[in-house]
């Protein structure tokens, strides 16, 4: 034990050292000043305040390259840049695609700046003149460092991180195959997070940022109608506001800090999801389900996304793990873990009413015996569960699930006719690689089409090149085959308490989605991101469907080929974004 601890301590110290070196070598943005209506105001990035439509304003900031050999400024103007000056030299901003596009933004590298300046330097004074198109006005700018030393520090840090994972896994006697699959998921999320701007492929990111800023800067939780997303439960935003404050103290871009915080939460979701699968399956079925969970595209897409989805996934996975361990061992301490995680999940995202449904079923299955037979920990767990369930029921019955539904426009309205819930348009699903909330021809009217397609790629057209379309089409085709394996696995499964639990979980998640779409008839109400943890019900059936003892060798080979093709294509697509 001492040797293991000694090794782990050295690994942690090594990671801390290279994290500090990376921070020291990174460039930074400082001295941000907003010039508006004759008033100069010191600001921090991002700058986002209410302005009049057509109002002109300007922003100054200093960019220090530090020890970084190179850097790239990622600038998102709100809404249009009208002039761009660096160290007194006007830059040809109109040649930068995205200079008048908040969502797209534009990149400004050190090499581009030096080319226009005619000389190299490490300190840059940037002056931007902008015009607001309406609503909030301002700018978001992030600086990312480059150069050999930063790359070297990052590589060494992540090598030490992988070694730390294997060391911890060995200590807790976790299967090497699961550790390897976890590392695959870890590296995939590192690569995707590192290459993804904080608001890329996000949902209501501006509202989430506003929510965090209010808590971080004003030390209060805002009223539910104070911002676009302020109706959400506060747990995730309070935690993120703490990260935001720490980032400001360290002169680090707060949105990037929150992005990496979400990445860490995604590892909790990944790890506890694998632990759940290990309590449901074993052998080859476990390996297949675990690999799919690790690389499932929509799950990876959520990893760096600013929003409360990923914390809900993590807490639901912890709660499900607690329920499964309690069923397997009858130790009440696991049910206490499940109750606490469920309560946190509900105060993170209201979708966690399903988490409490799973918890309630576990309670009924395990506590339906004379109270005298309950252990002390089970009695404590029962008391905590009842108190938490009453609290959640009171809140759920008195609050809207979607507090900003009235703000959606008619372009995302859909028809809730019965046929749209029973029909699956297989041709559209296979021939149209992506979907979105606006176009009927992409399948948004059909409940199962939209749910299945967003389970893979979200509501985004990820990569519209020939390569991206080919990969997305292959993934969609493999999905249909995996669905077939899942139905077979469900049919042949032996029904014990664990199978009942995951089946009821799947039913509750799908029923919740149907109810949400019926109550709020918008295409975005049908997005799979609300129920990603349902994969922890479905993937065991997929793995069991082609890897069970009764499966023929041909079926096993076919199933593994499809699983590996799905996994490889998903990784290639995500790393091509």
Task: Label every PLM stretch briefly.
Residues 159-166, 256-281, 314, 318, ...:
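Transmembrane-helix motifs of polytopic, lipid-linked glycan transferases
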């Amino acid at each position: 034990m001492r040797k293991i601890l000694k090794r782990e301590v050295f690994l942690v110290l090594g990671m801390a050292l290279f994290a500090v070196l990376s921070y020291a070598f990174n460039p930074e943005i400082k001295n941000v000043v907003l010039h508006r209506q004759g008033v100069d105001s010191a600001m921090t990035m991002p700058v986002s305040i209410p302005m009049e439509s057509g109002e002109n304003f300007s922003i100054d900031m200093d960019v220090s390259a530090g020890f970084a050999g190179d850097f790239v400024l990622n600038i998102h103007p709100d809404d249009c840049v009208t002039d761009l000056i660096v160290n007194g030299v006007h830059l040809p901003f109109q040649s930068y695609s995205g200079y008048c596009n908040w969502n797209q933004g534009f990149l400004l590298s050190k090499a581009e700046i030096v080319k226009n300046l005619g000389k190299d330097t490490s300190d840059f004074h940037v002056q931007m003149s902008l015009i607001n198109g309406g609503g909030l006005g301002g700018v978001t700018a992030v600086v990312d460092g480059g150069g050999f030393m930063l790359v070297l520090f990052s590589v060494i840090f992540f090598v030490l991180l992988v070694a730390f994972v294997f060391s911890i896994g060995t200590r807790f006697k976790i299967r090497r195959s699961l550790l390897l699959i976890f590392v695959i998921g870890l590296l995939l999320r590192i690569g995707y997070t590192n290459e993804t701007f904080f608001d890329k492929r996000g949902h209501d990111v501006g509202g989430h940022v506003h929510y965090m800023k209010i808590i971080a800067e004003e030390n209060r939780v805002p009223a539910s109608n104070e911002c676009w997303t302020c109706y959400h439960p506060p747990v995730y935003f309070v935690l993120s506001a703490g990260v935001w404050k720490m980032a400001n103290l360290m002169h680090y871009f707060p949105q990037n800090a929150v992005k990496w915080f979400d990445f860490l939460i995604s590892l909790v979701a990944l790890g506890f999801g694998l632990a759940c699968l290990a309590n449901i399956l074993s052998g080859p079925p476990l390996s297949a389900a675990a690999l799919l969970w690790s690389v499932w595209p929509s799950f990876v897409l959520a990893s760096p996304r600013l929003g409360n989805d990923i914390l809900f996934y993590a807490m639901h996975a912890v709660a499900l793990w607690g329920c499964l361990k309690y069923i397997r061992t009858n130790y009440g301490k696991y049910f206490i873990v499940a109750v606490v995680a469920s309560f946190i999940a509900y105060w993170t995202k209201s979708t966690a009413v399903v988490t409490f449904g799973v918890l309630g079923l576990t309670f009924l299955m395990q506590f339906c015996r004379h109270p005298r037979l309950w252990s002390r920990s089970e009695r404590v767990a029962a008391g905590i569960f009842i108190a938490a369930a009453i609290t959640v029921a009171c809140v759920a019955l008195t609050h809207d699930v979607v507090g900003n539904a009235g703000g959606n426009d008619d372009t995302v309205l859909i028809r809730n006719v019965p046929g749209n819930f029973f029909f699956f348009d297989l041709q559209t699903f296979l021939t149209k690689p992506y979907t979105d909330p606006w176009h009927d021809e992409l399948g948004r009217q059909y409940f199962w089409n939209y749910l299945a397609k967003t389970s893979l790629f979200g509501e985004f057209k990820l990569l519209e090149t020939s390569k991206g379309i080919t990969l997305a089409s292959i993934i969609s085709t493999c999905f249909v085959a995996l669905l077939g394996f899942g139905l077979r696995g469900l049919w042949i499964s032996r029904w014990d308490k664990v199978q009942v639990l995951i089946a009821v979980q799947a039913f509750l998640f799908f029923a919740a989605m149907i109810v949400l779409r019926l109550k709020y008839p918008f295409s975005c109400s049908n997005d799979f991101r609300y129920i990603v943890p349902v994969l922890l019900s479905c993937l065991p059936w997929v793995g069991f469907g082609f890897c069970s003892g009764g499966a023929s060798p041909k079926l096993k080979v076919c199933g593994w080929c499809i699983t590996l093709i799905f996994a490889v294509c998903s990784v290639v697509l995500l790393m091509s974004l």
